């Protein structure tokens, strides 16, 4: 597994300090020989007689050589650098289970930390409001501005991580380092404006873990196993804000509101250490570096990666247009994408409204402490795990069964679990709304919370899977704009939850939200049945 650290931050640092001796990449290791197809491709500019001698030498070698991949040669004479063979150890898809597990652990840890940092302030809001004498709305900005920051960040970080000359790791390293440094003044600041500005910046620089985490998992995971990996990643995104109130709920009443921010700093420090060992997972980025090394090794400028060949014909204005304009255009002109953006944003906003409504139910009505309230949030994790066996069974016995038969299932088949999930969302909300009463046991509304989060998990997972397949070319940009929409709606939800429940109460306020999700049930079934017709009419859907 040591060779995987070659392109990790610790590997790059070690190689720089050792003058290239420590953890050298494949092309710089002693005894490396250029694969025969690449040698032949490089000699095509040589005299014909020398080419024939090279070919005769290769044909005379034993037939036990590896099944090398033939490099493509463009009309301009560029040799496209790719994977040397189907078993190339530098290809992330060929890494060992242990190496892939390392990527999973580190990406999920970053995701957990960033989401945990959102909700950990919820337990400190009461004391923060008392200490600084500010209104509830100003206090809620401590959470909502963080959410706004991590929704805005992907508009920059996602396109950046897709550039092969950049890759996944630099955005991770730069952003987590800045996040860690920002967490120090955030933990000690003693004025409201400074704290709120720092919280927004924390969210902005924490967003790469959310924006590109799924892409990192996809880099090392085969198509048939990807739904399992992405669901585990989704569990971490729910577990972060669910565990945060438990951590802060027991410590803040004893140590003060600053303690919640110290806990963020410690978590960020742990993530930073683990991040140093995260290998580069982007295939195009790895091949970009390989092409640079081959040019240095052979002195032949014809060796180029596919990204270098493509960028020669790319216009900067077109790149910016595809990244920033096309997602908005698709949302405006494609009803399927518009519905999924609004629906995902709605259920996400409802989830964040829990941080305002649950204290009204469990502290005000059932006289729980902050720590006990934090334990209630763990029901969100139970909800995601509750539907995990069913989702995995559907993926294995239905979706992947088609792949095993050589059949490519239509994208709408990925929405089948979401049909059930879309029903669970309003059922859970209605149950929570009308059982959140002092005369009923607190377990009953908690069951509603569990059901709603279970449904939300299925909906989000299936919709993302559908968009990735049905709109393959624009999926990265669509996910970035979806992140933005979710964050902005969550920001709004945090801010309007208190006025909503002040005016309507818990029962009627939650019923209003449940009613909005009832309409989305019909939208989900419509997308499932009429999705193929909508895609045929779309200018943006994949064939």
Swiss-Prot record:
The chain crosses the membrane at residues 101-121, 141-161, 178-198, 203-223, 230-250, 259-279, 335-355, 374-394, 415-435, 440-460, 476-496, 512-532. InterPro entries: MFS, MFS_trans_sf. The keyword rRNA-binding does not apply. It is found in: Cell membrane. GO terms for biological process: xenobiotic detoxification by transmembrane export across the plasma membrane. Residues 24-71 are annotated as: Disordered. GO terms for cellular component: plasma membrane. Gene3D superfamilies: MFS general substrate transporter like domains. It is a multi-pass membrane protein. Keywords: Cell membrane, Glycoprotein, Membrane, Transmembrane, Transmembrane helix, Transport. Its main location: membrane. It holds the Pfam family MFS_1. GO terms for molecular function: fluconazole transmembrane transporter activity. Glycans are attached at residue 94. It comes from the Eukaryota. Belongs to the major facilitator superfamily. CAR1 family. May be involved in the secretion of pyranoviolin A. This is MFS-type transporter pyvG. It comes from Aspergillus violaceofuscus (strain CBS 115571). The lineage of its organism: Eukaryota, Fungi, Dikarya, Ascomycota, Pezizomycotina. The gene is pyvG.
């Amino acid at each position: 597994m040591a060779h995987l650290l070659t392109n990790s931050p610790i590997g790059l640092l070690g190689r720089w300090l050792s003058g290239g001796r420590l953890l050298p990449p494949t092309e710089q290791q002693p005894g490396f020989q250029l694969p025969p197809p690449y040698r032949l491709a490089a000699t095509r500019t040589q005299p014909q007689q020398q080419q024939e001698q090279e070919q005769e030498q290769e044909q005379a070698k034993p037939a036990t050589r590896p099944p090398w991949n033939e490099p493509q040669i463009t009309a301009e004479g560029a040799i496209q650098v790719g994977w040397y063979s189907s078993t190339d150890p530098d290809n992330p898809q060929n890494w060992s289970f242990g190496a892939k597990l390392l990527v999973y652990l580190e990406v999920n840890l970053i995701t957990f930390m960033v989401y945990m940092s959102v909700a950990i302030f919820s337990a400190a809001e009461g004391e923060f409001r008392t200490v600084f004498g500010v209104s509830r709305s100003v206090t809620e900005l401590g959470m909502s501005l963080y959410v706004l920051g991590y929704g805005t960040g992907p508009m920059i970080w996602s396109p950046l991580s897709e550039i092969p000359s950049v890759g996944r790791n630099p955005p991770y390293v730069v952003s987590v380092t800045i996040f860690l440094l920002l967490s120090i003044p955030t933990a000690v600041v003693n004025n409201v404006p400074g704290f709120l500005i720092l919280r927004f910046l924390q969210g902005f620089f924490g967003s790469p873990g959310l924006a590109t985490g799924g892409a990192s998992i996809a880099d090392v995971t085969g198509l048939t196993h990807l739904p399992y990996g992405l669901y585990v990643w989704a569990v971490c995104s729910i577990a972060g804000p669910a565990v945060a109130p438990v951590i802060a709920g027991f410590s803040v009443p004893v140590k003060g509101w600053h303690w919640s921010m110290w806990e963020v700093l410690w978590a960020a420090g742990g993530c930073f250490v683990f991040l140093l060992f995260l290998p580069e997972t982007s295939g195009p980025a790895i091949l970009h570096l390989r092409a640079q090394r081959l040019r240095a090794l052979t002195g032949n400028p014809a060796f180029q990666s596919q990204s270098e060949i493509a960028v020669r014909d790319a216009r900067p204005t077109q790149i910016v247009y595809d990244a920033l304009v096309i997602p908005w255009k698709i949302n405006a002109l494609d009803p399927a994408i518009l519905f999924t953006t609004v629906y995902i944003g709605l259920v996400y906003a409802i989830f964040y409204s829990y941080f305002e409504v649950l204290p009204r139910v469990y502290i005000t009505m059932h006289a729980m402490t902050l720590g006990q309230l934090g334990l209630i949030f763990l029901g969100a994790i139970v909800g995601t795990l509750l539907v995990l066996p069913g989702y995995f069974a559907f993926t294995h016995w239905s979706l992947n069964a088609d792949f095993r038969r050589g059949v490519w299932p239509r994208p709408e088949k990925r929405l089948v679990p979401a049909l059930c999930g879309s029903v669970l969302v309003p059922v859970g909300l209605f149950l929570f709304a009308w059982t959140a009463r002092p005369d009923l046991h607190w377990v009953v509304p908690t069951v509603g919370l569990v059901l709603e989060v279970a449904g939300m998990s299925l909906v989000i997972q299936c919709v993302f899977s559908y968009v990735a397949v049905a709109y393959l070319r624009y999926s990265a940009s669509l996910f970035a704009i979806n992140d933005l929409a979710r964050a902005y709606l969550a920001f709004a939800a945090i801010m309007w939850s208190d006025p909503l429940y002040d005016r309507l109460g818990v029962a009627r306020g939650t019923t209003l939200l449940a009613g909005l999700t009832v309409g989305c049930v019909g939208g989900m079934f419509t997308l499932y049945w009429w999705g193929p017709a909508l895609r045929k009419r779309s200018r943006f859907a994949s064939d």
